[in-house]
UniProtKB/Swiss-Prot annotation:
EC number(s) recorded for this UniProt protein: 6.1.1.23
Keyword Protein biosynthesis among record annotations: yes
Uppermost EC category: ligase
Gene behind this protein: aspS
Site (Important for tRNA non-discrimination): H38, G90
Organism: Protochlamydia amoebophila (strain UWE25)
Name the UniProt record assigns to this protein: Aspartate--tRNA(Asp/Asn) ligase
Chain positions covered by the region annotation Aspartate: 207-210
Amino acid sequence: MNLMMFDYRRSHTCGQLRKEKVNSQVTLSGWVNRRRDHGGLIFIDLRDRFGLTQLVFDPIKSPTAHLAAEKLRSEWVISVKGTVIPRQEGMTNPKLPTGEIEIMVHEMDILSKSKTPPFSVSDDLIEVNEELRLKYRYLDIRRGDVAKKLITRHQAMLAVRNYLNNQGFLEISTPILGKSTPEGARDYLVPSRVYPGNFYALPQSPQIFKQLLMISGMDRYFQIAQCFRDEDLRADRQPEFTQIDMEMSFGTPEDLMNIVEDLIKTVFKTCSNIDVPTPFKRLSHAICMEEYGCDRPDLRFGMKLHNLNHLAAQTTFSVFLDQIRENGLVKGFCIKGGADFSRKTIDEYTEFVGRLGVKGLAWIKRQENGLNSSIVKFFPESIHQQLIEEMEMEVGDIIFMIANTPSKTNQALDHLRRKIARDRNLVDPHHYEFLWVTDFPLFSWNEEEKRLQSEHHPFTSPHLEDLHLMETNPLKMRSSGYDIVLNGYEIGGGSQRIHNSDLQQKIFERLKFSPEELETKFGFFLEALNYGTPPHLGIALGLDRIIMILTQTENIRDVIAFPKTQKASDLMIECPSPVANEQLKELEIRVPDSQFSWT
């Protein structure tokens, strides 16, 4: 086919024409979305990423074009020339921006034919197996829903760049090939051909480089950065992800929080015309764990947790008493109107927490005649009213209680609280509840390795008033870290950084880095801190996760153009994949015979 014989440059897109253009001569190009034959006329819905336009092929007015249209099939690419005409009365489509007009086609050229697609591209409502969608991702993206999410992502990135530029931030790219440093997850490693036996690491974040930029005097930095983590995956994680990375000098956490809040407000308004109220709520890490059992609570509904150890200790219920003796935790929450839960429903929730490693779920209903449950007999009358008041129980309510180790109790109640909220439709998907979580512990205890580890990363500054606890009680030290949470998802985290070389050295030593390991992994950074480091702080926001929530998508893969599966594979290009033996020899790498094949 000689494509130069037909001028297929568009005069308009498929979402652009309105009734004001009636009688105009136009050229459109796109994909055949649907074809319909009606009484000799052929109707084609022509699609591009901008929208749909209806084409009309009339055998009397344009017999050649009509004859060619008889051959058209879904997903063929065509170009047409024609006249904009109004649709007949009663035939308009108010659901389409172009629904008042159609194009009477005079000329058509077929630019590209298509095999029959493995699934319908024209209908977003038809459920398609995700593996099939990912294998043919280039077809999946043509579906309107996926394309809209990618457009929203573009709008968000553009809004971020414009806003941060106006705030004096410089967009600076940092290296992709870097050094392997401990940041909490496994690194993706890249072998060096020039230096056999040595490896680069793909960045889990630009953390060290952005701090070096502050030492370099760049003052305010940002980057829409690709990051890589070889970690266990779930619906809101990918091995390759994008974050809005920021760092600034000579500021306070309050300054940075204000900038981030205004940035998010701008993104939501730009992308979805949503007005986000500011300032965001703030809760300490300790309050979050006490009232919600996690450090990323969903605040769109109630059901706060209550510590019941003091009341449980007054009962004769052995399950509670045994846990209290073992330094366990008895906690619960109240479900309004939950007294109508059937025994079957309660058993299902008991099984649910059982899968989280908790053996039982205690419950008490408040009815007109008082408290009702098989365990009420273990509760002395003297604490009934106290339980009712502390749990804010009204007639018709139910409370669920769990007794276990503090970590398991909190985890199970957090998951149960979220599940019940979903089951009872307590979550408004159109409501966005932001939260800053502050005052995290600086350290946590790694039971397996019997040592302290950083709760965030080792560059986070402690609260200066807690420095005296470094040697005596480091687990009580608070960090200057802050996470931002949206609807129960952590969408970002940051901190005030350590800008003093001696303090940074002490933190590394407290984390049990040997002098040799410290010099090998961080010697260059500790040296840089000795050359006049300004106070600085920063944050990284998860772009993929923000777009996932903004577009009300359950799966992060839906907002990434070419995502990996939950097994970190790409079904479309079939990777990871073997490489040629010659490449392995150059890298001096030996690999065992693989039993895996994509075929």
